Every structure is written in structure tokens, then in C-alpha cells.
Amino acid sequence: MEQLFTVWGETLDKEHVLDEYPRPLMVRDSYLNLNGYWDYAFTQEFVCPKEFDGKILVPFSPEAALSGVNRQLMPDEYLWYHRTFSVDGHKTKRADESFSEEDPESGMGADLTEERLLLHFGAVDQACVVWVNGQRIGKHTGGYLPFEFEITEAVQAGENDLVVAVKDLSDTSYHSRGKQKLERGGMFYTAQSGICQTVWLERVPEKYIKEVETLPEPDEEKVRIIVRSGAEYAVKIVLQKPKIHKELKKNVPDDPVEDMTGSRIADPVESTTETTIGTFYGKTNEWLEIPVQDVQMWTCDTPYLYDFTVEMEKDRVAGYFAMRKFTLEKDGQGFVRICLNHQVQYQNGVLDQGYWPDGLYTAPSDEAMIFDLEQMKKCGFNMVRKHLKIEPQRWYYHCDRLGLVVWQDMVNGGGKYKHWFVTYAATLMSWWKIRMRDIYSGLLARKEKEGRLEFVKEMKETVHRLKGHPSIAAWVIFNEGWGQFQTEDMTAILRKEDPDRLIDQASGWFDQGGGDFCSLHNYFFKLKIHPEKERASVLSEFGGYSYRIEGHSACGKLYGYGICRGKKALNRRYRKRMEQVKNLIDEGLCASVYTQWSDIEEEVNGVYTYDRKIRKID
């Protein structure tokens, strides 16, 4: 496979790697980025090596070119990470204040008698154990979700040792894996492992805000907010007037990565009488209702966000929400339609799998993520289906502020897939409208009880972590039967976790008749739909036309759903298929998702090439 690089990978500043504030929904003034060079080693035994193999650039996986390692972690191996950090004399700043070296209150000070220190991992694939100064802090399983540990008692003044051990079974286990495969090819791609999102430290008061959840209710002109903490405390919430976060601001001091702090990449929250809606008081762990008059609704053209700050004891965080509502409603012809703020919205989407040739699961920079999302809108898409992957929170923040609707897939897992069944046979069954119950765990690769329980746990946590993002309109539970089980039960669980959003319970085939969508995949046949009385008709995958460009393709072999010999041929087929989609709108079609945004390895059916340097579809 030929190694390709994006322009962001080619110009990567290795002293400032993905240093933007990683949690835009809840911004705190204390932030120490631990991205950068770490020691690494591969071992056969679960024993920390005395000597390491070299340096790895975190948060890029060892399989990614930007990591500097270029080596696959195998299921019978362990990957070890090591670095040091200091909690003395580090400068910090509030997310909405200017930087000041003279501030005596700033810094990751070693005196933590009245403060706590939290260690955050954006994602580590697949299972890991963490030590600080030789003390085991905790472990985590699941390669797609963030987690954190309190490390206060393990930290000492001066230099501290941080060690992470990783095990990744990839597609040889039932754990969530997405499109990763040790033997890549076709629609499955290079397996990656280890730390793949930002690692960071956060200093918090002893009594601190653990979580802020918002529930906007635009029809009632109010928002409900709950501030969660370990006990009951008084809280103060200052709500700002809505605005659109068009311009990003980055105020980072000229310090090396290990000494720097960052702020949320957005306009700072200002508290003046001209910009403030009001100040509201309540208690932690109780819902507080706040009236919002003259509501500015979030839309794709006007993505208004409401900034706010929360104060509790000595703690203070900043966040945002949006006033918007996704519903199913019937139009004048009786067709069920997807509506945004009670207005019919045809969701013209594109499938995005979040792979990069130089970073694999990790975008080379924040600017690279922004490029993809801005170009999607310029290409006429108002929706993106995030396929079998969970992105860093900043990706969803950019969708929020740019006005790009998101369908979020749950990440698939399970045993070894029977592709003859879930691909070829299922395609024909879908065309002939043969409905199969999801009770055949062997055919659908869900025999392990542990795997089923883990899927439910991760589905709930995915919703919990992401439901604050207004851009997310729909959850997709299962894709093409991969690891599918108890679909109606999963739909009920998900509906209870988040009644605010729409649900695609089975994208492609093995539809059990529930959820909000009749969700079809069609790559080979004439496009047609069969509108239903209660569910919206969506074409959740189609297209996939392949066109390989020499010098911008990673593989000589190509994969797709119709080979085109040139750009003109590709665009002719694309326009013809899109015209067929357009004609179905009057027959009840509510949304469509073109496959796909960019080429990935052998699968050269992207709007863009894998390196994002050439747009193939005009």
C-alpha cells in the first residue's frame, strides 16, 4: 500500500499536536495537553519494559504514519506508553480570560490539598491499564469512548511517571471495532490501536462540577439545565444571547506542548448587560428551568448557539446549547417527513467514515476536520452520517457551529461476520422485501452474552457523551446486520436514554419494523421506496461509484459499486443517480446518504481522494 499524506500531515507541527481544548461542551480554565512524543514498546508479556523501542507521536496510533512507528499491534502483543509530566508551575487560563503569567492562582500547582487532578483520555483502542508513579490508577475497555481517572493521590511534587499498557484484539473478538480488520481489504480497512485521541490533565476544586446536561424545549420557550456534582451546592448560571460561532479564536501561549494550556476554539463567553439574557440560581443535581424568550432557532443556515457559564463554590465551567427540534410529521399528501423545527427538511447526506491516510482514526489537525465539514456544506450536503466511529467532541462542536446535521452510528462489534449472508444474501432479501427476524445469533455474529451486554453499555454511554450536541438528529443502532440482536429491545433502551432524537434501528437490512425510519441501502438496483404510515422512508446508503486517481490512491487494487474510467464518467453516473433520488422525494423519500465522502484504501468511491487533495465529483 502506498503511503499518502494530507496537506495537514505534511505540515504538522509536532510540538503542537491537536492542542485545541478537547471538551467544548464543558470548558474549564485548567487544561494541560499531554499530546506529543511518548516512549513506546511492544512486548509479548504483560510486563513493563525497562527499555523502550523509541518515540511515538501521541495521539496517533502506531499503525499511522504520523506516529513515526508504522507497526501493527497484534492480538498476542502489548503496547506500552511512557512519559513524564510535572504539576509544578504550569500556567493556565480561563476559557474566557486573557493569559496572565502573574496570576498566583494559575498553574497545575503541586499543592493539591484542596484540589483534585483528573487525567483524561479521548480514546484508547481497545483495552488499557494506566499507572502513575507505579500506582495502578485504573483500566478501561472500549476503543471509541472517552474516560478519565482521578490521580490526585498518586501525584507528587516535581516530575511524575505516566505509563499506559494497551491490548487490542481488533476483529478477533466481540469488542466494538467499526471497519477495522487485521487483514484489510475491500470495505474493511487497516486496524489501528492504542491512544488515538487527545490525552490531557485537568485541575479541579475539591468540590467540582462533574457534568452539565441541557434539555432545550423550544416549543415551550425554555431550557432545562442540571448541574451534577457529588453533593448539594448552590449554582449560578449566566445565559448569553445566541450567536453564530463563525470565527475561531486561538489564544495559546508560546510555550512547548508539555507546558501549555489551551482554550475552547470559539468566541469567548462575555458577561455584559448587552450580551446576557439573565442570571439564574438553583441547586446541583436538580433540574433548573430557564425561560428563553424570542427564541433564535438552530438551523443549517442559522446555527445559533446559546453560550452559558455555571458557577458552583470555587468551580466555574462554560458550555452551550441550541434551540432546535427534530420530529416526524406528515405533509399535505400524508407522507411522513423529517422536520427540523416543524419545517420539512430533506436531509441530503454523505457517508463519512473518518479515516485519514496519515492518521487513520486520528485527523492530523483540527483544521483538517473543519475542512471536511465545510467542504461537505459547499458540496450541497446538509447532513453527514458518521459511520461506525465516534469522533472527538470537537468534531461535533464544528457540526454544531457550522449547521451540519449528523446521523451518528453506534459502533459495531460481535463475532466473525458471515459476509455471504450479511452482504450478498441480505442485498437480495432486501430487494425482494423478505423480512428476517433477528433471533439468529450465529448468522448475525452475536453469540457472546458478554458482547451483547457490552454493546448496550457502550450505546448508553455514546448517547450520554454526545447528546449535548444539537447537530445530532438521529442515532443508527445497527448497520447491515453486523452484530445485530434484539433490535426492538435496543430501540426501546435507546428511546428511553434519549427521547429527543430519531432512531434508525437497522440501516440497510434486517429491518424489524421499529424505530423512526424504513432505512434502505441500494447500490445495484433501480431506486424505489415503499412509504409507510408511521415511519420515514430513507435511503441510508447509495452510490459508491469508484474512480481511482494515480498518485492519490493508496492501493493499486480498487473496490466500489461501479467502476468509472474517468472523472466525466463518474460525474455522469453521479448526476444520473442523484436525479433518480430527487424524483423519489415527491413519492415520500425523506433523506439520502451518498457513499462516501473520501476514498479509503481500496475503496475509491469518495467525493474526495483519500489525501483530500482532489475533489472527484463536481
Predicted regions and their residues:
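N-terminal pre-domain segments of enzymes
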Residues: M1-Y31
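Accessory beta-strand-rich segments of carbohydrate-active enzymes
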Residues: E2, G9, D39-T43, R71, ...
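Predominantly extracellular/luminal regions of secreted and cell-surface proteins
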Residues: N35-V58
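Active-site-adjacent substrate/metal-binding segments within catalytic domains
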Residues: A65-S86, E115-F121, Q126-V132, G138, ...
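Short coil/turn motif common to extracellular beta-sandwich-like domains
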Residues: T113-R116, P218-I226
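Aromatic/hydrophobic beta-strand junction motif of beta-rich domains
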Residues: F121, V223-G230, H342
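Extended acidic/polar, glycine-enriched regions
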Residues: E153-E159, R228-D255, I265-D331
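Substrate-binding/catalytic cleft of secreted carbohydrate-active enzymes
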Residues: M383-K616
